[in-house]
Design a protein with these regions (language model features):
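The feature encodes the CheY-like receiver
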Residues: 60, 69, 78
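Two-component/phosphorelay signaling modules centered on CheY-like receiver
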Residues: 15-33
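Active-site beta3 strand of CheY-like receiver
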Residues: 48-54, 59
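Alpha4 helix (beta4-alpha4-beta5 surface) of REC/receiver domains from two-component response regulators
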Residues: 66, 88-124
Length: 140
């Protein structure tokens, strides 16, 4: 079950994966907007200000790493949590988290349904963690 009214920006250059994940996340209750490359991702993120961004690392035009750094450097998007999507089996978790990612998710082409369910659960966990931090900061 999605965090109520959560807007997700899905940045994925593979049309198949973009459409499949958009469908699965919409079915899980998220409002999904998409981008197919790094340039489009930066524009959409700035224009739509999603609650969370799912960012593929291997993108045309601008790499996911550059997009992540640009998002974190922009005051309008700096506080939007980013979940990095990667198909790389050996992820440098410390480097990704140090660059500002809230989490990473290893894409699996073997079982897209289970992968989409795990992705939705990861999104919910990150959004809940951000909401808890925001609520604690507001009370302080």
């Amino acid at each position: 079950m999605a965090v109520p009214n959560s807007k997700v920006l899905l940045v994925e250059d593979s049309k198949f994966l973009r459409m499949a994940n958009e469908k699965a996340l919409s079915k899980a209750g998220f409002e999904v907007i998409t981008a197919a490359d790094g340039e489009e991702a930066l524009k959409v993120a700035n224009d739509k200000l999603p609650d969370i961004i799912l960012l593929d690392m291997m993108l045309p035009k601008i790499s996911g790493t550059v997009v992540l750094k640009a998002l974190k450097a922009n005051p309008a998007t700096a506080n939007i949590p980013v979940i990095v999507l990667t198909s790389m089996s050996q992820v440098n978790e410390e480097k990704l988290l140090g660059a500002g990612a809230a989490a990473y998710f290893e894409k699996s082409s073997l079982d897209l349904d289970k992968s989409s369910d795990r992705l939705a659960a990861t999104i919910e966990a990150v959004l809940n963690r951000v909401n808890i931090k925001t609520n604690h900061a507001a009370k302080a």
